[in-house]
Design a protein with these regions (language model features):
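Acidic/polar-rich alpha-helix caps and helix-coil junctions
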Residues: 1-64, 69-75, 87-236
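Long, low-complexity, acidic/serine-threonine-proline-glutamine-glycine-rich intrinsically disordered tracts
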Residues: 80-87
């Protein structure tokens, strides 16, 4: 992923291929997909944070943001391309990860990727890097270097879509949309677009271009107060 941000697509592709062919990680199957979100250290999980009932972010937990009984700030936008695709494609197992909370206090449809272990919405292990992301990294690097990007997308989709038929080619836009479908609610989409020098449009803050200072978060005040060596990021 770092190589993609650095524009070293050949290295990104080589590294991704090494993980795909030489690691013990396996893509989730269609049968497994809806079950893995309440499990720890699953077959795709290359890096994830360990969260427990005693060590968690409480009301700053991702599960609290993705539930109508929490902050309710991560509902799907119902007329946006992602939600429209999921609703229109029931053969895609990823469409089953929509929580209908239209009767909740913060009414809407929410991602079901953070159900909370033992009934506690605070307790979810965020999956930082998983194998499907690596396939998508390989596809993005391949399409930028003239390689066979479609093969990576086909392999991923066969493990997501019942009755899927291979395509012979994909574009960068196809790959970025596949990232939205596969990695929604996993802190990916905005950075994917900025990495490719595209803007993100948010109804609350407007257009955020790839070179906007807000694409890099501020250093927390507590960290700045530790000493004089740290300098706040520009714009804050």
């Amino acid at each position: 992923r770092v190589n993609l941000y650095n524009g070293d697509n050949a290295a990104a592709l080589a590294d991704a291929q090494a993980v795909i062919t030489g690691s013990p990680y396996k893509l989730y199957t269609i049968e497994d997909y809806t079950k893995v979100w309440i499990q720890e250290f699953t077959s795709e999980s290359i890096l994830e944070f360990k969260i427990t009932t005693t060590n968690n972010a409480q009301r700053n937990s991702v599960g609290y943001y993705c539930d109508s009984e929490g902050y309710g700030e991560c509902a799907f936008v119902e007329d946006a391309p992602l939600y429209t695709y999921l609703v229109a494609n029931p053969d895609d197992i990823r469409s089953k990860l929509i929580k209908d909370q239209t009767s909740g206090s913060e009414s809407g449809y929410y991602p079901a990727k953070y159900p909370g272990r033992e009934g506690n919405m605070y307790v979810n292990n965020p999956k930082i890097i998983r194998l499907s992301d690596v396939y998508l990294i390989a596809a993005e690097a391949a399409v930028k270097t003239g390689g066979d990007a479609a093969s990576y997308i086909n392999t991923l989709r066969k493990n997501r879509i019942t009755g899927y038929e291979d395509v012979t080619s994909v574009t960068l836009e196809d790959i970025l949309f596949e990232r939205r479908v596969e990695l929604f609610a996993e802190n990916s989409m905005a950075f994917d677009y900025w990495r490719n020098k595209m803007s993100v449009n948010n109804p609350y803050v407007g257009e955020v271009k790839y070179n906007d200072y807000r694409t890099i978060l501020p250093i927390p005040l507590d960290e700045l107060n530790l000493g004089d060596a740290l300098v706040q990021n520009p714009g804050y």
